[in-house]
């Protein structure tokens, strides 16, 4: 069962990762850019943070400290060692131009 959660986060920093090999099929090899985007909740009292692993075109965008991004998180449950655990993945991320548009 999947559950989606939309929220606004503030960019702390962005760190580039070496491009990694991707293989679409046995005969073609290529490279895909990746980066980690470190986010925090835009509340000065909050200690919640999030690391987004971006790939492809999203990783080429230069996010700056203080940028606000709209993030859609996908929560899903998987069975591991006879127990269900919750996994969180980022389904979508977009730069917010003006926060008032989202309130």
Outline where the language-model segments fall:
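Single-stranded nucleic acid-binding surfaces, predominantly the OB-fold ssDNA-binding core
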Residues: 1-103
């Amino acid at each position: 069962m999947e559950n989606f959660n939309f929220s606004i986060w503030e960019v702390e920093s962005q760190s580039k990762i070496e491009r990694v090999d991707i293989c679409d099929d046995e005969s073609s090899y290529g490279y895909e850019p990746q980066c980690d985007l470190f986010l925090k909740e835009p509340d000065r009292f909050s200690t919640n943070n999030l690391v987004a692993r971006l790939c492809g075109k999203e990783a080429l965008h230069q996010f700056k400290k203080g940028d606000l991004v709209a993030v859609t998180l996908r929560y899903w449950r998987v069975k591991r060692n006879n127990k269900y655990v919750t996994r969180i993945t980022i389904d979508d991320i977009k730069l917010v131009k003006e926060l008032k548009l989202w309130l």
